[in-house]
Amino acid sequence: MFIDGKWIIREDIDVFDPYTLENIEKITALDREETKNAIEVTEKHKEIMKNLSPSKRYKILMKVAEHLSSKKDFFAKTISIDVGKPIKQSKIEVDRTLTALKLSAFYAKELRGETINSENGLIFTKKEPLGVIGAITPFNFPLNLATHKIGPAIATGNSVVLHPSSKAPIVAIYLTKIIEHVLKQMDIPRGVFNLATGNGEIVGDEISKNDNVNMVSFTGSVEVGESISKNAKMKKVTLELGGNNPMIVLKDSDIKLAAKSAVKSKFLNAGQVCISVGQVLVEEEVVETFTKYVIEETKKLILGNPLDKNTDIGPLISPESALRIENLIKQSVSEGGELLIGGNRQNSLISPAVINIDEENILSKIETFGPILPILTVKDSEEAVNIANNSKYGLQAGLFTNNINNAMKIADELEYGGIMINSSPTFRKDNMPFGGVKKSGLGREGIKYTVEEMSETKTVVIHNI
């Protein structure tokens, strides 16, 4: 759609407002040959990015942050319309994006190698870019997750082809316009950054297969991640995939705090968050109290128009997604789950649901990606850990306890990429390592760590003459 400094404008794909269901935009869908061309252009410009000084890369990122900051309200509103995210959550996403850009700018100047002692001469290392980064991003955080890939790519001197989700591409288009403006202002050829909109089956597939792409950075579903991993052959990949993230609540914890955390975290962005609470594993002595607090907190939530400042939960990304959640609730109940509150659907809206389940229930095994909070009673921490680890996923886990010995023991036992103690799994800072084990992903994100992933270490040895 934006290739080699030129916009390709067609009306190929309808984009809908998830709340009103109105058609808000028609966008270009690149075919395979156009996608190949976008990648070829990106590849031809990789030397330009490589040769930019660290201070110029820093300046690009800081200028993008500056322009974005001047349009914070516009971008927050666009996120809410594009995704259905409540406006107060969209504003937080914009702020986090600014942090990610500024951190990326910082690391543009911090790229450094090391000197290694040698009796026979000098050994040193230097960091170099990989070349072309294919960034494939999801709908749920269309601005922040894009900059988590674009920022480190630019910081390390890579050229970029960005493929946003076709479900919510509008934010990426406006971000690209800012990048275009900055590159033009700095007299840098616009072909160093290209935007490839369209269907993932074509555009994303070509990016993952194309030999001119040196690394694919993908955030999305396990199924697509596995496909990318197979297609990528020997190219580098980072995959940030899904999870059924457990939150363990022990009897010695602050039960009210745990309940508030579970509700706030589970229903963020209507549950459409990869690190959303998948299930809460509660010791039997306190499960009744915990459940009471959860229902009280859930009743306080306001469901509705994402542009209303009082709204806590907006729509899912589409009516089809909401129907899938409605059917999951029905299946859970048919398997013995007890629906305690919520679960009513109207178009793309689903009222937040709380369900008592057991380990064999469908909700204990999958990533729901919607506003369902399953509660599962356990005898003790050992059973909780066993259930949590009996999963193909391993993204993040939460643990509530006031016993530091329990906390450290369970943190060691849990098979997850991140363990949040006295917090839900839904915790992330933009500079912490982030990623999962098992089928939840490969590699780590977080600006500092993505910079490492997107650069190569070259060793230089100078022998005594």
From Swiss-Prot:
Residues at the active site: E240, C274
Protein name in the entry: Lactaldehyde dehydrogenase
Reaction equations catalysed: (S)-lactaldehyde + NAD(+) + H2O = (S)-lactate + NADH + 2 H(+)
Function, as annotated: Involved in F420 biosynthesis through the oxidation of lactaldehyde to lactate.
Keywords: NAD, Oxidoreductase
Keyword NAD: yes
SUPFAM superfamilies: ALDH-like (SSF53720)
Residues engaged in binding NAD(+): G220, S221, V222, E223, V224, G225
Listed pathway(s): Cofactor biosynthesis; coenzyme F420 biosynthesis
EC main group: oxidoreductase
